[in-house]
Amino acid sequence: MPQTLHVHSRVKDYDILFTDHVLKTLADCLGERKQRKLLFITDQTVYHLYQTLFEEFAQQYNAFVHVCPPGGQSKSLERVSAIYDQLIAENFSKKDMIITIGGGVVGDLGGFVAATYYRGIPYIQIPTTLLSQVDSSIGGKVGVHFKGLTNMIGSIYPPEAIIISTTFLETLPQREFSCGISEMLKIGFIHDRPLFQQLRDFQKETDKQGLERLIYQSISNKKRIVEQDEFENGLRMSLNFGHTLGHAIESLCHHDFYHHGEAIAIGMVVDAKLAVSKRLLPKEDLDSLLQVFERYQLPTTLERADVSATSLFDVFKTDKKNSEQHIIFILPTETGFTTLAINKDDHQFVEKLDSLL
């Protein structure tokens, strides 16, 4: 497997570096910046699992650490403010750097702080979950939730580099592993059916090298897409398959009942059912999706009686993908994807949605 993928960005190019030696790779990335101040942003789970690694950071660099509570509720302006306070207290300048080491929440949060502190300081991502390695760290999207709404405030702000080490996945709980598989299945189902089929048949326990190949293949797909459409005006919209409903579920469940990959799995099933109902997708493809989600213990139906189709529809109206009058869904087709525009006043769609959940 190649050690580096180079990502072209209209904002700033960056490298995705594959390694088993995080400390050495980070040192190589920093270069002359080794003498600058570094703020490592992480969460309590990662900090306790890899405390020795953070101790080595402290020995080698002028390093500070900010440790967040785990979970989606840390993606908040309150947490951003706390990190700003630490940066100001330690007199961080535009030439100093943030390094995120954690899952998607930590990466999105730290990237947003980097994008906005002094109108932008450099940062490096070290994603530690499967989902963050194959999806959220790539493409420059950073942001936080606001008033319960998912990723409501954010920007496109690429990192200096992304360091991928599959050794972090050895401590990843099965639930989090399945959430990462969910995003890999998403990109495979829309853009790379051979990848989808390989994931369907993959045996995690006996094929570590196979996992590395699948991760590389998933990342390569996302790299290709974001290079063609960095600001989500066309092709990159396809990566929102499952996300209109998934983000609404996360918002209504306060970002703590379902993990991101689980909410997106439910969203993908509903999008696929819509596609089947419009004869855009063969029912056999929907059945295949349901089977592979079941294999990875991903939910396929909404299990919260307090979350109704009506409440979901109200949250849809705040989605970033919307046009002025329409809610946008991404539907899979036999050969790719298409968009479905639902009028914001179409209450008949609420009944349709209720039948699909």
Swiss-Prot record:
Cofactor binding mode and count: Binds 1 divalent metal cation per subunit. Can use either Co(2+) or Zn(2+).
TM segment ranges: none
E.C. designation(s): 4.2.3.4
GO cellular component: cytoplasm
Molecular function as annotated in GO: 3-dehydroquinate synthase activity; metal ion binding; nucleotide binding
Localization in the cell: Cytoplasm
Amino-acid biosynthesis among keywords: yes
Source taxon at top rank: Bacteria
Cited CDD domains: DHQS
Protein's recorded name: 3-dehydroquinate synthase
Organism: Streptococcus pyogenes serotype M18 (strain MGAS8232)
Lineage of the species this protein comes from: Bacteria, Bacillati, Bacillota, Bacilli, Lactobacillales
Gene label: aroB
